[in-house]
């Protein structure tokens, strides 16, 4: 299955949540797309579990294999599996670039990383799924810093909305200060439903 690049509004309406940010389409039509979208049937527990997994995959832009690998990695580690899964998702390089305010969306963050605009601890990293650790420094290449289009876009965004990240606007670098706690992750994801789905 390829990564979804279709209409964002359609996905937001499917989950009845602004998956990719504020959605005017969702405000106008807060029901699923399709001929029978307005008819809301009571979902089974399994359907809810699938929906929560699908929502998380769309939010973070992962394919099934990538998502499953992160889940099993979290399941093997000591701790609360659902929270560990969210931590793995949050500390992906593309997500941190987005959280720092370097880009307006995760999709554009993924492109910035893939096109070798981002550094980690001074070295170029072009793998969006790169797992960051506490203490890692995220920055822009010198060539990217000289691009007015990118630097103006960065300066127009508000930064440091996340307690677990730090942003230095003068040096244009960010730092992972700690792993995010569940209450610091704003997305409305029922991670326990995902755990139950994979545990069957």
Swiss-Prot record:
Gene Ontology molecular function: any one: rRNA binding
Keyword RNA-binding: yes
Pfam families: Ribosomal_S4 (PF00163), S4 (PF01479)
InterPro entries named in the record: Ribosomal_uS4, Ribosomal_uS4_bac-type, Ribosomal_uS4_CS, Ribosomal_uS4_N, S4_RNA-bd, S4_RNA-bd_sf
Domain of life: Bacteria
Keywords associated with the record: Ribonucleoprotein, Ribosomal protein, RNA-binding, rRNA-binding
GO BP: ribosomal small subunit biogenesis; translation
CDD domains linked: S4
Occurrences of domain S4 RNA-binding (ranges): 91-150
GO cellular component, one term: small ribosomal subunit
Record bears the keyword RNA-binding: yes
PANTHER family xrefs: 30S 40S RIBOSOMAL PROTEIN, SMALL RIBOSOMAL SUBUNIT PROTEIN US4M
Function of the protein: One of the primary rRNA binding proteins, it binds directly to 16S rRNA where it nucleates assembly of the body of the 30S subunit. With S5 and S12 plays an important role in translational accuracy.
Subunit record text: Part of the 30S ribosomal subunit. Contacts protein S5. The interaction surface between S4 and S5 is involved in control of translational fidelity.
Family: Belongs to the universal ribosomal protein uS4 family.
Name of this protein: Small ribosomal subunit protein uS4
């Amino acid at each position: 299955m390829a990564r979804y690049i279709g209409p964002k509004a359609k996905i937001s309406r499917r989950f009845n949540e602004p998956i990719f940010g504020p959605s005017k389409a969702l405000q106008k039509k807060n029901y699923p797309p399709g001929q029978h979208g307005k008819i809301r049937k009571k979902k089974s527990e399994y359907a809810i579990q699938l929906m929560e997994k699908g929502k998380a995959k769309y939010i973070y832009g992962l394919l099934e294999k990538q998502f499953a690998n992160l889940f099993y990695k979290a399941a093997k580690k000591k701790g609360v599996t659902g929270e560990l899964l969210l931590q793995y998702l949050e500390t992906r390089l593309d997500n941190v670039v987005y959280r720092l305010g370097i880009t307006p969306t995760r999709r554009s963050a993924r492109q910035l990383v893939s096109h070798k605009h981002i550094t980690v601890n001074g070295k170029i990293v072009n793998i969006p799924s790169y797992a960051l650790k506490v203490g890692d420094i995220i920055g822009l290449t010198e060539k990217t810093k000289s691009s007015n289009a990118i630097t103006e876009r960065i300066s127009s965004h508000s930064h440091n909305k996340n307690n677990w990240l730090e942003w230095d606007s003068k040096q244009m670098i960010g730092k992972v200060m700690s792993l995010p706690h569940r209450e610091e992750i704003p997305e409305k994801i029922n991670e326990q439903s995902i755990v139950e789905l994979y545990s069957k």
